[in-house]
């Protein structure tokens, strides 16, 4: 069974990491499953790729505004990067011919780049599944973006299933985003998708893991970790965190993310050096550190929050408010249940952050873990994998189109 996963990753790494967690669950659930994962992330090669999963690297995007993406590295126009990526995706679909296409968040891809391939797959009997994170944005913003394009109806026309990586009782996407009854009937809530902790067999050798060893508390000082996802817009939070590190009663570790701007990364390195904090640019499987640290300071992105809660780690969130409000809505929803602490980024300073971290360190971790488990499910990847396998089985019996490849006659090498 062949699966093609798509994520645009114009901002951060969240979409690719979520798709990768589902791919890992999928190949674990079926020895017949194989996944081609299309992404524009420049850091995909650093991620832990399981067997029977291959990365199709697309030219990278950068987010210009909501629903607008340009090239991150190539000096080309928006229309040119859209055409290039669209043709690569269409070629992958028409060569690989997946039984099921899983699309993360954007029904027709960034800048509509997936529309042609999606139509070709539909015309040849392939199945398509749309995956949505728990919260997309404020309902009024989503409505303003979707209605002019008739997206709810078009999603119904092109997609056999919609998977929400969250829980209705935490945030009701179907109601908030105005799904039609027909589209609601095709929608399933999977629970939260969180990458599993590594097993001893998964762990790298000492020689390869030395620079990223799991942090341990020392001299009676707990470890507090600050992470801002990909790092494109986390400078202010990390700067404030490092300002608290000099006289804090904890050991401070900060991870800037691979997308941090060079100038900002240098300033953070100087701050870390003065305050005695530890600074990393990128840590593979950073979520595995969450069980070992006393608290995590973060922005409020889906993957960081989900992995932190899955491991019962006290979280202090300073959510992003622009260009989307999904992090604010997530932090507020989970904060109302007492599962995390969150601060208004407009009022962030060293004093308020230090107070919030101190409060988080005072929590009973066993009690917090029990409280989290009473509200949240973290089997979203496994549930999503079962939905994808069901779609693949439903497609079985349909003939995969034949592939005609023109192989050029090789030129004779000159002696």
Each language-model region and where it sits:
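Conserved nucleotide-sugar phosphate-binding/catalytic loop shared by glycosyltransferases and other
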Residues: 5-7, 25-80, 84-86
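A short, glycine/small-residue-rich beta-strand->loop->alpha-helix junction that serves as a flexible
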Residues: 7-20, 43-44, 234-235
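Donor-nucleotide binding loops and adjacent catalytic segments primarily
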Residues: 23-25, 177, 192-295
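Short N-terminal targeting/anchoring amphipathic segment
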Residues: 89-111
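Active-site-proximal region of nucleotide-activated glycan assembly enzymes
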Residues: 118-189
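A donor-sugar binding/catalytic signature common to diverse glycosyltransferases
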Residues: 285-329
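C-terminal amphipathic helix plus adjacent low-complexity
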Residues: 355, 359-415
């Amino acid at each position: 069974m062949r699966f093609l996963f798509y994520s645009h990753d114009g901002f951060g790494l969240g979409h690719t990491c979520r798709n990768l967690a589902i791919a890992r669950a999928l190949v674990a659930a079926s020895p017949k499953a194989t996944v081609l994962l299309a992404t524009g992330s420049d850091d995909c090669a650093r991620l832990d790729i399981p067997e029977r999963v291959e990365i199709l690297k697309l030219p990278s995007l950068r987010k210009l505004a909501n629903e607008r993406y340009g090239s991150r590295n190539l000096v080309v126009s928006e229309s040119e990067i859209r055409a290039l990526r669209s043709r690569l995706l269409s070629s992958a679909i028409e060569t690989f011919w997946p039984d099921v296409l899983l699309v993360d968040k954007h029904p027709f891809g960034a800048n509509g780049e997936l529309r042609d391939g999606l139509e070709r797959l539909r015309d040849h009997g392939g199945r398509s599944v749309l995956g949505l994170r728990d919260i997309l944005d404020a309902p009024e913003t989503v409505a303003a973006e979707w209605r002019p394009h008739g997206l709810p109806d078009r999603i119904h026309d092109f997609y056999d299933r919609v998977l929400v990586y969250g829980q209705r009782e935490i945030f009701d996407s179907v109601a908030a985003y105005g799904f039609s009854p027909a589209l609601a009937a095709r929608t399933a809530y999977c629970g939260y998708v969180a990458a599993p902790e590594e097993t001893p067999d998964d762990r790298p050798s000492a020689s390869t893991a030395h620079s990223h060893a799991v942090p341990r508390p020392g001299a009676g000082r707990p470890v507090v970790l600050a992470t801002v996802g990909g790092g494109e817009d986390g400078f202010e939070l990390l700067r404030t965190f490092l300002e608290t590190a000099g006289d804090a009663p904890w050991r401070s570790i900060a991870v800037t993310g691979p997308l941090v701007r060079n100038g900002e990364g240098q300033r953070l390195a100087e701050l870390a050096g003065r305050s005695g904090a530890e600074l990393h640019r990128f840590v593979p499987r950073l979520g595995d550190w969450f069980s070992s640290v006393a608290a995590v300071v973060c922005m409020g992105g889906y993957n960081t929050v989900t992995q932190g809660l899955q491991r019962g780690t006290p979280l202090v969130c300073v959510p992003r408010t622009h260009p989307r409000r999904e992090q604010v809505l997530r932090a507020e929803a989970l904060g109302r249940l007492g599962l995390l602490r969150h601060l208004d980024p407009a009022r962030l300073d060293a004093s308020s952050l230090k107070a919030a971290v101190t409060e988080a360190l005072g929590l009973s971790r066993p009690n917090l873990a029990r409280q989290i488990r009473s509200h949240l499910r973290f089997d979203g990847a496994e549930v999503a994998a079962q939905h994808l396998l069901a779609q693949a089985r439903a497609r079985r019996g349909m003939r995969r189109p034949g592939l005609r490849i023109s192989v050029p006659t090789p030129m004779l090498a000159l002696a």
